[in-house]
Amino acid sequence: MTPPTHSPVELWYSHRGGATATGLAVQKGWLQEAFADGGTDLRALEDAASRDIRLAHYHHGQTGLIREGGNIAAIWARSEGQSAVVIGITWVDEYQGILVRRDSGIRTPADLRGRRLGLPLRRRALIDLQRASAQRGFVTALELGGLDPRMAKWVHIERPDFEFPQRLTARDVELDALRAGHVDAIFLRGAQGYAAVQDPALHEVIDLNCQDDPLKRVNHGTPRPITVDRAFLDRHPEIVRRYLAVLVKGARWAATHGDEVPTLVAADVPGHTAAEVLGAHGPLLHRSLLPSLRPSYVAGLAEQKRFLLEWRYIDHDFDIDQWIDPAPLADVLRIHHPDAHAGTPHAARWNIAKEQIHAR
């Protein structure tokens, strides 16, 4: 009698352009190798034929999806009642700059009083990540300058809608609006922001990534949660543990291969070079990819949730601790014994590293 056959378990993975442990594991082929035994059908979400499945990177409604990406969509989805839980968090600091025209007369955050602050706007987005990210950056800068963000003058910068994945380099519509004089200041982060600030016609009012307080550095990409839907985790905990083990392996490899990591990350950042990735994240990038659930990372998610509630990007509050399931990662870390140095780079170390990069 022929034994019954079982269909492979469908496992989707997703990571948005940026420095992620998942992206590194995919670039090196480790994730594919870990699930090549035939029992699991590993698929990239961006390759799905269904638009709704692709958009699960934002709405988190696809079963069998392990997602590593920006925190705004993850928090929004949880607020909307999705069952995805956080099984790990990475903290990769990145450039976060308020930029103005050099001839604007704006030199410090306090000088932003009464100025036109540009916020991108995507009218059809499930959750407008870019707008929330920019407003978060401005609010932090205004508060550091002793100003009331509620009194700020916000100006819409219309952005075209797009579907995940965004394969082409996006137009720099915020930069266009700034240079054309439609707004007085914009917020840019990551490699895009780092590349833009090299323009001698622009002035950097503040780089929030230089703040000592990590909660002042919280934005869409910092911290990044790793999520999976609760039903899939309950049915297939061994698959989730295997996935996390690959990310831990990749993070440990990255910690000793700093020269290679920026090039690998740049492959997931369309239109930007390894040098720009290194400039945006600093030379400690390779030591920042280890998934963790340390209290400071969780506090970063809680701070972002507070902001999104206060500024009405989400409608419903929820308990951060109930959103997190620490068991899978705890099981993996007991086996892999990660290096103790992996964690959030201190801003003072970032400032030194940034000076070293600019001196090259």
Locations of the language-model features?
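Short glycine-centered helix-capping/turn motifs at secondary-structure transition points
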Residues: 24, 28-29, 181, 200, ...
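Short, surface-exposed acidic
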Residues: 37-45, 147-154, 269-286, 315-322
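Secondary-structure end/capping motifs
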Residues: 236-315
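Pocket-lining segment of extracytoplasmic ligand-binding domains
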Residues: 72, 163-267
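Short, solvent-exposed loop/beta-turn-alpha elements that line the ligand-binding surface or hinge
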Residues: 32-37, 210-216, 287-296
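Short, glycine-/small- and polar/acidic-enriched structural segments
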Residues: 4-150, 154-157, 348-360
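Short, flexible helix-coil linker/hinge segments at the edges of structured domains or between repeats
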Residues: 148-172
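Conserved C-terminal helix/tail region of periplasmic/extracytoplasmic solute-binding proteins
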Residues: 308-360
